[in-house]
Amino acid sequence: SAQALGRVDPVTRALIPALHPSTTFQRDADGSYSSGRAYSRPHNPTYDEAEDLLAALEGGHDCLLFSSGMAAANAVFQALLPGDHVVAPKMMYWALRKWLVDFAIPWGLRVDFADIQDLGTLEAAMRPGRTKLVWLETPANPMWTITDIRAAADIAHGAGARLAVDSTIATPVLTRPITLGADLVVH
């Protein structure tokens, strides 16, 4: 993975990016930050490198790092609007399912849990024009079932929805969902 970006530190010649856990950055004489970085929490060079690397490994355009997989998943669902329809798998990471039931549904998301490994069931769960997101895990936790990502993407896109794939278990070493038609990948 160190070679995926093909970057070499111009000062140290290191192939592995340096870690910048917390720092402030030098201001220009006029008080501005020409580097675009003022403090490492919102703009961290280590995060930038990691995000670029993950995007390259996944075959994606952009990447955002979060403090946890749950934070990343929550960001995907919270990008939707109350009233939007979501199709999620019956068998999925328990903590995320509980968050959907306890928080997302009361907030106003319309969530149908379906056996989306069965593509006919997935197609039947879609509400063309109203379904905004299909969320799938493959392999799915905890039974390691596999869903055909390309077919699920075709079904989602045919109904005007986006496909998000939780690929935590497979990682881009084994599966690259974006190359199979997914719109978002979460780890």
Protein language model regions, located:
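Short conserved active-site loop signatures built around small residues
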Residues: 1-19
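Conserved PLP-enzyme active-site core in the AAT-like
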Residues: 67-187
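A general structural signal for well-ordered alpha-helical segments in protein cores
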Residues: 18, 47-51, 149
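Conserved N-terminal alpha-helix of the aminotransferase class I/II PLP-enzyme fold
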Residues: 24-71, 79, 95-104
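Glycine-rich beta-alpha junction loops
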Residues: 6, 21-27, 169-171
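Residue-level signal for pocket-adjacent positions within structured domains
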Residues: 3, 16, 34-37, 187
